[in-house]
Amino acid sequence: MLVDVGSARLFFDVVGEGLNAATPDMALRPTLILLHGGPGYDHSTLRPYFDRYSDTHQLIYLDHRGCGRSTGEKETWQLDQWADDIAVFCSTLGIDSPIVFGQSFGGMVAMHYAARHPTGVSKLILSSTAAQFRLDETVKMMRKLGGEYPAEIA
Protein backbone atom coordinates (compact mmCIF):
# COMPACT_ATOMS: atom_id res chain seq x y z
CA MET A 1 0.00 0.00 0.00
CA LEU A 2 1.08 3.58 -0.54
CA VAL A 3 0.40 6.71 1.50
CA ASP A 4 1.05 10.26 0.33
CA VAL A 5 3.28 12.27 2.69
CA GLY A 6 3.58 15.37 0.54
CA SER A 7 6.59 15.21 -1.75
CA ALA A 8 6.73 11.39 -1.68
CA ARG A 9 4.59 8.29 -1.45
CA LEU A 10 5.62 5.77 1.19
CA PHE A 11 5.10 2.06 0.68
CA PHE A 12 4.03 0.07 3.71
CA ASP A 13 2.87 -3.44 4.47
CA VAL A 14 0.69 -4.42 7.43
CA VAL A 15 0.89 -7.81 9.11
CA GLY A 16 -1.50 -8.63 11.96
CA GLU A 17 -4.82 -7.18 12.98
CA GLY A 18 -5.17 -3.91 14.86
CA LEU A 19 -8.02 -5.31 16.94
CA ASN A 20 -7.75 -8.42 19.07
CA ALA A 21 -10.92 -10.41 18.32
CA ALA A 22 -10.03 -12.88 21.09
CA THR A 23 -10.87 -10.31 23.77
CA PRO A 24 -14.47 -9.44 24.69
CA ASP A 25 -13.93 -5.71 24.11
CA MET A 26 -11.91 -6.10 20.87
CA ALA A 27 -8.87 -4.49 22.51
CA LEU A 28 -6.39 -2.68 20.31
CA ARG A 29 -3.12 -4.45 19.74
CA PRO A 30 0.00 -2.29 20.02
CA THR A 31 1.25 -0.97 16.67
CA LEU A 32 4.91 -1.63 15.89
CA ILE A 33 6.41 0.39 13.03
CA LEU A 34 9.53 -1.26 11.63
CA LEU A 35 12.21 0.87 9.94
CA HIS A 36 14.77 -0.94 7.80
CA GLY A 37 18.45 -0.22 7.28
CA GLY A 38 19.98 1.43 4.26
CA PRO A 39 19.29 3.74 2.72
CA GLY A 40 18.79 1.63 -0.34
CA TYR A 41 17.26 -1.44 1.26
CA ASP A 42 13.59 -2.13 1.83
CA HIS A 43 11.42 -3.60 4.57
CA SER A 44 11.75 -7.19 3.29
CA THR A 45 15.00 -7.62 5.26
CA LEU A 46 13.00 -7.41 8.51
CA ARG A 47 10.07 -9.70 7.63
CA PRO A 48 11.73 -13.03 8.53
CA TYR A 49 12.45 -11.78 12.05
CA PHE A 50 9.28 -9.90 12.98
CA ASP A 51 6.29 -11.57 11.30
CA ARG A 52 6.12 -13.98 14.25
CA TYR A 53 4.93 -11.10 16.48
CA SER A 54 1.79 -10.48 14.44
CA ASP A 55 -0.33 -12.45 16.91
CA THR A 56 0.34 -9.84 19.63
CA HIS A 57 1.09 -6.66 17.64
CA GLN A 58 -0.02 -4.97 14.47
CA LEU A 59 3.19 -4.76 12.44
CA ILE A 60 3.73 -1.98 9.92
CA TYR A 61 6.75 -2.40 7.67
CA LEU A 62 7.65 0.96 6.13
CA ASP A 63 9.95 1.67 3.18
CA HIS A 64 11.74 4.99 3.74
CA ARG A 65 11.40 7.79 1.21
CA GLY A 66 13.49 6.83 -1.84
CA CYS A 67 13.87 3.20 -0.73
CA GLY A 68 12.15 0.01 -1.82
CA ARG A 69 8.79 0.83 -3.37
CA SER A 70 8.59 4.34 -1.86
CA THR A 71 9.10 7.41 -4.02
CA GLY A 72 11.09 10.51 -3.19
CA GLU A 73 13.65 12.59 -5.02
CA LYS A 74 17.25 12.33 -3.85
CA GLU A 75 17.25 16.06 -2.99
CA THR A 76 14.71 15.28 -0.24
CA TRP A 77 16.80 12.55 1.38
CA GLN A 78 17.44 14.32 4.67
CA LEU A 79 17.22 12.96 8.21
CA ASP A 80 14.69 15.65 9.18
CA GLN A 81 12.55 14.70 6.19
CA TRP A 82 12.69 10.95 6.88
CA ALA A 83 11.70 11.59 10.51
CA ASP A 84 8.90 13.96 9.53
CA ASP A 85 7.65 11.40 6.99
CA ILE A 86 6.93 9.05 9.89
CA ALA A 87 4.96 11.76 11.68
CA VAL A 88 2.86 12.49 8.58
CA PHE A 89 2.45 8.76 7.93
CA CYS A 90 1.14 8.17 11.46
CA SER A 91 -1.13 11.21 11.36
CA THR A 92 -2.57 10.24 7.97
CA LEU A 93 -3.35 6.70 9.10
CA GLY A 94 -4.52 7.65 12.61
CA ILE A 95 -1.69 5.81 14.36
CA ASP A 96 -1.22 7.22 17.86
CA SER A 97 2.16 6.80 19.62
CA PRO A 98 3.34 3.53 18.09
CA ILE A 99 6.27 1.44 19.18
CA VAL A 100 9.06 2.23 16.70
CA PHE A 101 11.84 -0.22 15.84
CA GLY A 102 14.82 0.95 13.82
CA GLN A 103 17.67 -1.18 12.50
CA SER A 104 20.95 0.42 11.37
CA PHE A 105 19.99 3.47 9.26
CA GLY A 106 16.39 2.92 10.37
CA GLY A 107 17.60 3.35 13.95
CA MET A 108 19.02 6.77 13.11
CA VAL A 109 15.69 7.75 11.56
CA ALA A 110 13.82 6.35 14.58
CA MET A 111 15.96 8.33 17.05
CA HIS A 112 15.55 11.49 15.01
CA TYR A 113 11.78 10.92 14.83
CA ALA A 114 11.59 10.46 18.61
CA ALA A 115 13.63 13.63 19.17
CA ARG A 116 11.55 15.74 16.75
CA HIS A 117 8.19 14.22 17.71
CA PRO A 118 8.56 13.01 21.33
CA THR A 119 4.82 12.43 21.82
CA GLY A 120 4.69 10.43 18.59
CA VAL A 121 6.33 7.31 19.98
CA SER A 122 5.44 5.12 22.97
CA LYS A 123 8.60 2.99 22.92
CA LEU A 124 11.79 3.04 20.90
CA ILE A 125 13.69 -0.15 20.02
CA LEU A 126 17.09 0.20 18.34
CA SER A 127 19.39 -2.37 16.73
CA SER A 128 22.87 -1.99 15.22
CA THR A 129 22.66 1.77 14.84
CA ALA A 130 24.53 4.96 15.64
CA ALA A 131 23.39 8.30 16.97
CA GLN A 132 24.82 10.11 13.95
CA PHE A 133 26.27 9.46 10.53
CA ARG A 134 28.64 11.91 8.90
CA LEU A 135 28.72 11.14 5.20
CA ASP A 136 31.47 13.68 4.56
CA GLU A 137 33.71 12.04 7.17
CA THR A 138 32.95 8.56 5.80
CA VAL A 139 33.87 9.59 2.24
CA LYS A 140 37.09 11.22 3.49
CA MET A 141 38.06 8.04 5.38
CA MET A 142 37.21 5.82 2.38
CA ARG A 143 39.44 7.95 0.14
CA LYS A 144 42.26 7.70 2.65
CA LEU A 145 41.92 3.93 3.08
CA GLY A 146 40.92 2.77 -0.37
CA GLY A 147 40.94 5.49 -2.99
CA GLU A 148 38.21 6.92 -5.18
CA TYR A 149 36.21 3.77 -5.94
CA PRO A 150 35.32 3.01 -2.28
CA ALA A 151 34.66 6.73 -1.73
CA GLU A 152 32.15 6.70 -4.61
CA ILE A 153 30.38 3.71 -3.04
CA ALA A 154 30.16 5.51 0.31
Predicted segments — roles?
Residues 1-5:
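Short acidic-hydrophobic surface loop/beta-edge motif
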Residues 6-75, 79, 89:
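Conserved HGGG/HGGXW glycine-rich cap/lid loop of the alpha/beta-hydrolase fold
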Residues 55, 88, 115-119:
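Short, well-ordered alpha-helices that flank and scaffold nucleotide-derived cofactor binding pockets
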Residues 80-98:
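Conserved acidic catalytic loop of the alpha/beta-hydrolase fold
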Residues 98, 102-104:
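Conserved alpha/beta-hydrolase "nucleophile elbow" surrounding the catalytic nucleophile
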Residues 107-118, 124:
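Short glycine-enriched nucleophile-adjacent loop
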Residues 122-154:
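Flexible "cap/lid" loop of the alpha/beta hydrolase fold
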